[in-house]
Design a protein with these regions (language model features):
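Membrane-embedded alpha-helical bundles that constitute the cytochrome b-like, heme-associated redox core
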Residues: 2-160
Length: 160
């Protein structure tokens, strides 16, 4: 368990530095968050970038949970480190470790459920690609940014 946890954390650590800048909350995210009812009805709300507010919250929730799991796992890791800490601290660490794992697992379940709820999202999660129509409908600002980059690249290459 501890060694697998360290490998899991290292994998997440790499992903964190790859995606953190896309997951900073913006003004437009407030509109998305206050319109969750409409979103659950299938309506698109706001000028969403690469990630919507729900995805950003999930990213930061996973970050906090992974850091908590690492720190509390380190404290409780027998026989290597646990002898460095008093028993009451180890007990608190184990409780926080369990709660953090529970929150992480619940978050993943909600994430998968949301992906199933919104058609086309499973493909995005599994294959890492979406159709242009899907991007335009669900993440319009990101779609415009991608199209602007494509247009600039085409113009630079002499294609129109």
């Amino acid at each position: 368990h501890p060694f697998v946890g360290v490998v899991m954390f290292l994998g997440f650590f790499i992903q964190f530095f790859r995606y953190w800048k896309y997951n900073l909350m913006e003004k437009e995210d407030v509109k998305w968050l206050t319109s969750v009812g409409q979103i659950l009805k299938g309506e698109e709300v706001g000028d969403t970038g690469k990630y919507n507010a729900g995805q950003k919250i999930m990213f930061w929730l996973m970050t906090v949970c992974m850091l908590t799991l690492l720190a509390t796992g380190f404290i409780a890791w027998r026989p290597y480190f646990a002898d460095m800490f008093p028993i009451p601290l180890i007990r608190i660490a184990l409780l926080l470790h369990a709660v953090s794992a529970l929150v992480l697992i619940a978050g993943i379940i909600v994430h998968v459920y949301a992906a199933i709820w919104i058609k086309g999202t499973i493909r995005a999660m599994v294959e890492g690609v979406v159709t242009q129509a899907w991007a335009k409908a669900h993440h319009p600002r990101w779609y415009r940014e991608i199209m602007a980059k494509k247009k600039a690249k085409d113009e630079a290459a002499g294609r129109l």
